[in-house]
Structures are given as C-alpha cells and as structure tokens.
Design a protein with these regions (language model features):
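Alpha-helix N-cap and loop-to-helix initiation/capping positions
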Residues: 44-52, 80-87, 112-122, 144, ...
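N-terminal small/glycine-rich loop or linker at the start of catalytic domains
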Residues: 1-6, 66-73, 107
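Histidine-acidic metal/acid-base catalytic patches
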Residues: 1-9, 13-31, 61-64, 96, ...
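Active-site acidic/histidine proton-transfer and metal-coordination neighborhood
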Residues: 18-19, 31, 54, 59-62, ...
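A short beta-strand-loop structural module common to alpha/beta enzyme folds
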Residues: 30-41
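Active-site-proximal loop/turn and secondary-structure-junction residues that shape catalytic pockets
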Residues: 11-13, 36-38, 73-76, 104-108, ...
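Active-site anion-binding loops
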Residues: 39-57, 61-67, 122
Length: 271
C-alpha cells in the first residue's frame, strides 16, 4: 500500500532532535514530523537561531529524512496565541513541510482562553491566507476533553470551510480523551480526515499508556481497511508516548520505533 508513513519526533520527547533523526533513519523511515510544541518538545522552535535551524535542516538532508509535517500546537481559541501559531506556520514553511498540526487547545500548557466552535472556526478561518501563502494544510488534532473526537473536529473544520483545514485523527487520543472507539468515530468524519497520528493505546482508557504501534488495543487492521475502502490516503505519522513514567532510555524508544515499523510492514505497508 502506497502511503506516506512518518515518525513524529515527539516519540523522542526528552531526547535531542539528533537522537530522533538517528533512530528514525535506523528503523528505515523516510519521513519525519518535526515537533515544535511549546513547553513540551521543542525539537525545532521559532526562537531558535537561524544557524541552529539550518543545522537541523542539514542533518535531515544528510539522513535522507523528509520533514513533510510539523507539530506546532497552540491554543487556537486564544487570540493571544494566534501570532505564535503564525510563527509556527512560517517555521513549517522554512523546513518545506506540507502539513502543520495543532490541537484546538494547548497540547501541554494550560489553556488561557476557551471559545465555542463558531468562534474558534472564525479564528482558524483568519489563518487561511497564511496557509495559502506558505502552501500548507492545517490538520486539527483530536486532543483534549472538548475536542477529543473526530466528529467534533470535523464539525469545526466544516465551519472553517477551507480545503486547507482538515482533521488529524489521533487513534489513541480519541480513546484517552474522547472515550470513543476509533473505528466507530472514524466513520463520523472520514471525509474530513487528511492526516493520521498512528498511536496505540494500552491499559485503561484514562491511563497514559501509548506503546509501539501494534502493541496495544487499537484495531488497526479494521481502521486501515476503513481508510482503504473510503479511498482515504492520508499520511500516517507514528506517535509513541509510552507511560507516564516515560521510556527508561533511548534504546527503548528506538526499539519501539523499530517495532512499529515492523508491524506496519507486516500489515502490507512500505515505509
């Protein structure tokens, strides 16, 4: 099956971008989602020096990894954070990305503002000229209690009314935050899904436990079949966030990335 399959550098939360690049390359991947999430994983970030950003770009080129997407999470309900997100859009363009990922609220910071769907759709609609200028697509991630299902995110994307704003379907977040079955929820929004965070879920629904893909309870064969049947060729970006304790060392992260690669190859995918 021909589909972009990447690894989110957030799998290497707590480790350097250099370590992430090395591990992702070693597992056989050709695509990477860079992480620029404030207060969490800042592998690349707008306040880094131009010299440092060029250094990262050169390392990606040397490794043969294509930075096709960037996680640039900001609270899109907070007008004070929109300027920060525009900087993230420009950073994504600098790296030549096609996609920028954001949750509606903050991913790992406290939300300083909330808004109803109509209001946040208006804020996002105002970003469309910036997305057009830099030829990017914004994919809204299923994340947080209020925005934890694809159904809700699809409603917001439709309110925005632009082909440049779609849904990033996180297969584990919809369980952890939304308390829904991903295969059931997907059918509520599949026409609006343009990107997938391929993340597995283990343990109880409300427990932070996101192992290597294929090691948890998500029914990926069914999920893949639904996408194929709908002709939805959205890119996959693997995200592994382990337990609340985190991975014990870099070797554990590298092994989880490799295990995920082997699982997808066994499912018929080409990296």
């Amino acid at each position: 099956m021909n589909r972009i399959i990447a690894v989110n550098s957030n799998c290497y939360h707590g480790f350097s971008i250099e370590e992430a690049v090395a591990g992702i390359k070693a597992a056989g991947f050709r695509y990477i989602e860079l992480t620029a999430t404030k207060g969490w994983t800042e592998h690349v970030f707008p306040d880094q020096s131009f010299e440092r950003l060029l250094e990262v770009k050169d390392k990606l080129d040397a490794a043969g990894l294509i930075p096709f997407a960037m996680s640039g999470h900001c609270n899109l309900m907070d007008i004070e954070r929109i300027g920060d997100f525009i900087k993230n859009i420009r950073l994504a363009a600098f790296f030549g990305c096609e996609y920028i990922v954001s949750s509606i609220g903050e991913a790992h910071l406290k939300d300083n503002a909330v808004a109803d769907n109509e209001t946040v759709a208006g804020y996002i609609r105002a970003l469309v000229p910036h997305l057009e200028k830099y030829n990017l697509k914004l994919v809204l991630e299923t994340h947080g209690k209020e925005h934890g299902t694809g159904k809700v995110l699809a409603e917001i994307a439709r309110l925005v009314g632009s082909e440049r704003v779609k849904v990033n379907y996180d297969t584990a977040n919809v369980i952890f935050y939304g308390r829904v079955d991903p295969c059931e929820d997907l059918m509520e929004c599949i026409g609006d899904v343009a990107y997938v965070h391929l993340k597995d879920k283990a343990g109880a629904d409300d427990v932070w436990d996101f192992p290597a893909v294929g090691k948890g309870c998500v029914d990926f064969p069914k999920f893949f079949g639904q996408l194929e049947a709908a002709g939805n060729n959205s890119p996959f970006s693997i995200e592994i966030e382990f337990t609340a304790a985190g991975p014990k060392d870099l070797a554990e992260v590298n092994q989880a990335v490799l295990d995920s690669a082997e699982y997808l190859i066994a499912q018929g995918y080409t990296l």
